[in-house]
Amino acid sequence: MTATFLMSLLFGLAFGQTMSLCVPTGYTMHIERRECAYCLTINTTICAGYCMTRDSNGKLFLPKSALSQDVCTYRDVIYRTVVMPGCPPHVIPYISYPVAVSCRCGKCNTDYIDCIHESVTTNYCTKPQKPYLVGFPV
């Protein structure tokens, strides 16, 4: 191996974990309404990644505020609204969904963020799909 490659590898291993890997990441979600005929497939962005955190061994001697860990959370969010296709006239067809513009590592604010990852949640359609691209149904 060359010295340059070896130095690059060592540099990456040493400093790679210190950089924030909390970034907006592409995510596909499926939205259904019981009253509407179709399922809507939407591509958006969510905050995902890793944040540096420390887990202290002396938890009994620290205040509770020192025990909370940083999570990858939203810095800036915009909401987009789309029309759900195939809804009857008495149903409001508008759906708003979040789009992560920027992310940060910080404390999880449970007032507006779900801080728990539920692995049993499904993300699929049970009805025929209508993809949604750049604000226009296809």
Swiss-Prot record:
Residues carrying a glycan: N43
Pfam families per UniProt: Cys_knot
InterPro entries for this protein: Cystine-knot_cytokine, Glyco_hormone_CN, Gonadotropin_bsu, Gonadotropin_bsu_CS
GO annotation (BP), single: G protein-coupled receptor signaling pathway
Record carries keyword Magnesium: no
GO cellular component: a single term: extracellular space
Glycoprotein is among the record's keywords: yes
Propeptide: 133-138
Cited SMART domains: GHB
Any one GO molecular function term: hormone activity
Positions of disulphide bridges: C22-C72, C36-C87, C39-C125, C47-C103, C51-C105, C108-C115
Protein name: Thyrotropin subunit beta
Protein location: Secreted
Keywords, in A-Z order: Disulfide bond, Glycoprotein, Hormone, Secreted, Signal
